[in-house]
Every structure is written in C-alpha cells, then in structure tokens.
Amino acid sequence: LQRYLRRWSYSNADWDELIKLLESTMGQDLQAWNEIWIKESGAPVIEFQKNGIVMTDESGKNRVWPQAVSVFWDYMGLKRTLIPLRDSLTPFRYGAAVVLPDGDVMGYGCFLPTDFSIRFLDDELGNLNDPLYRAVAWQALYEGVLHKKVKGEFFLKLCIKHLPQEKNNLVVNRTLSFLRIIYSTYLDEGSRQLIQDDLERFCINM
C-alpha cells in the first residue's frame, strides 16, 4: 500500500493498478480473484454433503469464489476445521456431520444447513456457548427456509423453544426479524392458524 501511495501520490490510479502492484509484491495471479470478488455481482450457495463441500453459482456461470471457511462438525465431540475452497467441489469426509457451516463468519455466500445440523440444532442450539455461533445457527436455518431445506413451521417452533432462554439482544432481535419474515411470507394461512396460540404465548413471554 505504501508503494501504491508513493507511486500515485500526485496522480490518479484505478483499482486495477493496485491489483497489479499487489501481484508483483506477492508473486501471485490475482486477476481471477479480482474478477469474481470485485468486478462481478452475486454470491455462491455452499452446501455440505457426504462427498464434500459443494459450491454452486446460481447464475449458471459456474463461477468459483476462492475462500476459506471455518467449519464446525460433530464426531465424538464438536470440532472446528478451517477449509480452503478452491473448486466447485471440495472433498471433506465429515460433510454429513457439519453443525455450523461457517461458524466464525469467515466465508462469503449462502451457507445451507445439513439434515444433521438441523437435528443437532433442534436439540443443542441453546447450548452453544458463544452468541456468535448461535447467531450463525439461526442464519443458516433461515437460509434453509429460503431455499426450502427447512420448513417455516419448524423454524418458528425452534424460536418458541430456544429464544426465551437467549440472553444476547442482538441474537434475539435478528432472529425475531427472521421470524416475522417467515411468518408473513413463507407460511400459508392454515399453518399460521395451527401455530397461532403457541406463538402468542411466546410473544407474551418474550
């Protein structure tokens, strides 16, 4: 950055000039990164499957967003692994046991929950010690509703089950915003009526 400022201290330079300077300093080709991360819009959908981590470009352009993600998975205890994603499929033998797909919020994209993580969070969401992890869990479940991997009714039942014990106001407020969107947009009238009484008691207790 100092070289960049010295070189163009009295003239105009664009972003590409900075990228070229970084390339010469780092000895790496940054053009692909520059195109995907800076010049183009969009974000990947990232799913964890038995054979690994699948990155999908919903625009159909088959783009890949190189990045590293912090994955929490459960095999004889909760474990954390930092995984570099460099292709549309990244092998990961514990993909089906993932609990939090982007636990430290290092990644970029839509991270969908697995069937295992949905069952795990149903039981253990409130027991996650770090409020960041609980926030990540709610975000993943919300994304699951948007992508039809989690039923809206199930999300609301999780809110009724776990949110009354939540002490972090940021987690509560953000999750309640998810609840409002799901209730008004992703539930039909019959589903709303079925959960209405439980939801009213929940709102009173909150």
Model-derived features: where do they sit?
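Non-catalytic accessory/interaction domains
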Residues: 2-206
